[in-house]
Amino acid sequence: RPWINIAWAFLTAGITLGSWWAYYELGWGGWWFWDPVENASLMPWLIATALMHSSSVTEKKGTIVTWTILLSIAAFSLSLLGTFLVRSGVLTSVHAFATDPERGVFLLVMLALFVGGSLFLFAFKGHKLASNQNANGWTRELLLVINNMLLVSMTIIVLIGTLYPLVSDILNLGKISVGPPYFDFFFVPTTVALAIFMGMSASSRWSTSNLSESMKRVILPLVICLISSIFVVFAIEVFSRNYSFSWSALITFIAVLWIFLTLIEDIHLKLRTKMVGVIKNKSFLGMTVAHCGLAILILGVGLSSAYSTQEDLRMKPGSSTYISGYR
């Protein structure tokens, strides 16, 4: 598991530095362009995130062992696929570095050997990896598995959107491009669902529990985040002189506050039950910081999408115009 965390941390740092470089040095603005090469780094990151959570379940409960192994194979395979897409020149992108066919063939052969060999070993040895027990009731284990399914679904969405133009070109179906509308259509509801189950998993126990018991612990955070989100959105609309209610901003605030409040509730529960040692644990601190970081990311993406205004104008030197009431 430490190796998974190290790999995930370096991949996260690489994506963050790449985004910072593109934003400040190139002046592109925005937060994500769904470029094929950007997607090539996002896919292993999503799978590695799922792998971190599934490995914690395997470590603590001894379950979903085969699933964890499959995620390990998928994470490394998608890393190799990303290298192939960037270095072979099969995809058109401003981030692509090479168009050498020989290098592309070598990377494709290496990808086939590693992926094929891993799946071959798994097919013949996977049956020996037995789980200790199955999930019983509404536990944190079950919720982490659900989040795993959502992360894998997001990876498949990105994979289809990235490779479909390539497959279409190979089959002579014409050159097409898959843009942000496709990814936004699938990613927005999936991310909201991910935030919901993330908050519920933070408030659930590893031991057997039921849905009603978990709901009792999250009912107060749920009421607070709903009331606070509605108030904040109305306040933003009034002070920005824009009286059109933004549902996307409301959903963003609800998701973000839900994550923060359920984390606070989890910390409060541990303090109340005198589990201070767990709070000081590096694993718990890392989880808390990572979830807070994801909440901030959702906040930035959601609000920039809800309140941004773009217009294409023809202007002459010295002329001015008004956008959203500002000159």
PLM features per residue range, with description:
Residues 1-88, 92-111:
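Hydrophobic, small-residue-rich alpha-helical packing segments that form membrane-like cores
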Residues 36-42, 93-323:
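Contiguous transmembrane helix-bundle modules in multi-pass membrane proteins
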